């Protein structure tokens, strides 16, 4: 808001240094913890994706942050100084564009399938498989840390999967509480063995 409104209220820029300092401090912590979580995803998700795709595809993950952060897994104080450097280098551009160009909101998780960027080259089925692999990997990490599975919500994930991949997902989510939504599938009772809720005209039965 400081940058956005600074043209009409130049005095707002007086608070920019203090705000940037606070943002860099919080951003450094966020980048640090994100990087360590993504490192764990990198250990869990590719194996799940390999099983999911029948060994035909290779999933890789990479955390991309601002250019001055040389190691996202470094200590927060190191990242803090590097974020401040990025802010200083881009201060003029930020004021001119009235947009914040430095910080964890600019980060991205790069997902690649067989060395190609998923967001540019993956099919809808490949994208769905990669997303499910990440979700299942995060679920396993949660279980490792807490000793129990989180409640898992899967919204209409089975309709676009072939029978083999449907079976893989259903076998992989055993344990814990799982909610799966779908439009129509007469095979669900046999596949799941759980309770079935029907929603019609806003009424659950």
Please identify what each model-predicted range represents.
Residues 155-157:
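Walker B catalytic acidic pair
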Residues 6-151, 160-164, 168-171, 177, ...:
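Conserved NTPase motor "head" modules and their coupling/switch loops across ABC/AAA+ ATPases, GTPases
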């Amino acid at each position: 808001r400081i940058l956005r409104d600074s043209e009409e209220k130049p005095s707002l820029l007086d608070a920019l240094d203090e705000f940037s300092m606070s943002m860099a401090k919080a951003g450094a912590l966020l980048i640090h913890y994100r990087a360590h979580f993504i490192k764990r995803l990198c250990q869990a998700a590719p194996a799940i994706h390999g099983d999911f795709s029948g060994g035909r595809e290779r999933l890789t993950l990479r955390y991309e942050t601002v250019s001055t952060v040389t190691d996202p897994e470094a200590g927060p104080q190191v990242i803090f100084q590097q974020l401040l450097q990025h802010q200083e280098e881009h201060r003029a551009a930020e004021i001119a564009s009235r947009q914040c160009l430095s910080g964890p909101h600019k980060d991205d998780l790069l997902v690649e399938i067989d060395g190609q960027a998923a967001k540019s080259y993956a099919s809808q089925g490949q994208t769905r498989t990669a997303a499910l692999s990440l979700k299942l990997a995060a679920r396993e990490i949660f279980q490792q840390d807490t000793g129990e599975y989180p409640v898992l919500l899967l919204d209409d994930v089975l309709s676009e999967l072939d029978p083999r991949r449907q079976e893989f997902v259903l076998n992989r989510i055993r344990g814990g509480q799982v909610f799966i939504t779908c439009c129509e599938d007469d095979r669900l009772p046999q596949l799941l063995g759980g309770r079935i809720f029907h929603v019609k005209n806003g009424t659950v039965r």
